[in-house]
Design a protein with these regions (language model features):
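Active-site proximal loop and beta-alpha junction motif in alpha/beta enzyme cores
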Residues: 1-70, 75-263
Length: 263
C-alpha cells in the first residue's frame, strides 16, 4: 500500500499540519486502518479509494479513533491525488461517510475545498473554561467543537491549557481565537484531547466554525486565518451562507510502501 506524508496548510516543509495519506485499490479492515493511524501517530491519517473518474471515497482516522471530518487531511489527500493520480484534473469529489460530498479544486492560490459550516450555538462561559485556559473567554460557542473567543492575540499564542480540564470541556476539538494582527483577520489554536491529541497544528474543520464567527463580527466574507501552533499555518477562508471554502497549500515530505499484509 502506498503512503504519502504531507505537510498541509503551508508551502514549507516542517510547517503546517502533518497528514499521512494512504491511497488504496480497495478498503482494508477497520482494525488495520486504526493500527496504521496509531503507528503513524499524526493527528490524522487519511485513507482513500477511487470509485469512479475523479471521485474518491475518503475516511480519516486519528490515533484515538475514526473522525467524521478532517480539513487538513482532506487537503493532503487532494494534494497527493492531484500530484500523482489526477494530474490532468482540476477537480476531485470526495465521498465521505457522515458529511456527504466534498469538492476540491486546484487553482493559482492552491487547493480550495468546500465544506459545510458549523453552527454557532452560544453557550455559557464557565469556571472550568477559565480554569482550563488560565483566562476567561468573552464568548463561547458549541457545535461538534467548542470555540472560545478571547480579546488578546498574545494570550492565544502563549496559552498552555491544562489537558485534563480540556477533556472535561467536551467537543471533538476545542478552538481558541482572537481578532488577528499582522495582516490576519484572526489568530487561533486548536486542541483535541478527546482524540488523544493535545494540540492540533492546523485545523481546517474547526475553521468551519472560526471563519463564520469572524465573518459575522468583521462583516466580511473572506477571512485570512493564522493558526498559531509551533508549526503554524495559513488558511484562506470564504464564508458562503451554510458553506465555508478553505484554500491552502501543501508540500510532500515523503512517500513509501507500507509493509502490511492486506487480505
Amino acid at each position: 500500500m502506498k503512503q504519502y506524508i504531507v505537510d498541509a496548510f503551508t508551502d514549507k516543509l516542517f510547517k503546517g499540519n502533518q497528514a499521512a495519506v494512504c491511497v488504496m485499490e480497495k478498503w482494508i479492515s477497520d482494525d488495520l486502518m486504526q493500527n496504521i493511524a496509531i503507528e503513524n501517530n499524526f493527528s490524522e491519517t487519511a485513507f482513500t479509494v477511487k470509485n469512479s473518474d475523479g471521485c474518491y471515497d475518503l475516511r480519516w482516522l486519528a490515533p484515538g479513533g475514526e473522525i467524521d471530518f478532517c480539513g487538513h487531511a482532506t487537503l493532503g489527500s487532494s494534494f497527493v491525488l492531484f500530484s500523482f493520480y489526477e494530474k490532468k484534473s482540476s477537480t476531485i469529489v470526495f465521498h465521505t461517510r457522515q458529511k456527504g460530498d466534498f469538492i476540491a479544486k486546484r487553482n493559482e492560490k492552491g487547493i480550495t475545498m468546500s465544506f459545510p459550516a458549523f453552527s454557532l450555538k452560544p453557550v455559557p462561559v464557565t469556571d472550568l473554561m477559565t480554569k482550563a485556559f488560565g483566562a476567561k473567554p468573552k464568548e463561547a460557542f458549541f457545535d461538534r467543537d467548542l470555540l472560545c473567543v478571547f480579546d488578546s492575540v498574545d494570550l492565544i499564542k502563549n496559552m498552555s491549557p491544562n489537558e485534563k480540564d480540556l477533556k472535561e470541556l467536551g467537543g471533538t476539538c476545542i478552538g481558541v481565537t482572537a481578532k488577528g494582527d499582522d495582516g490576519f483577520d484572526c489568530v487561533s489554536r486548536v486542541f483535541a484531547p478527546q482524540l488523544n491529541i493535545y494540540e492540533d497544528p492546523v485545523t481546517g474543520s474547526t475553521h468551519c466554525m472560526i471563519a463564520p464567527y469572524w465573518s459575522s463580527v468583521l462583516g466580511k466574507r473572506n477571512i485570512k486565518a493564522f493558526q498559531a501552533s509551533k508549526r503554524e499555518g495559513v488558511l484562506l477562508c470564504e464564508v458562503n451562507g451554510e458553506n465555508v471554502s478553505i484554500t491552502g497549500n501543501a508540500v510532500l515530505f515523503s512517500s513509501c510502501e507500507l509493509n502490511v499484509a492486506i487480505d
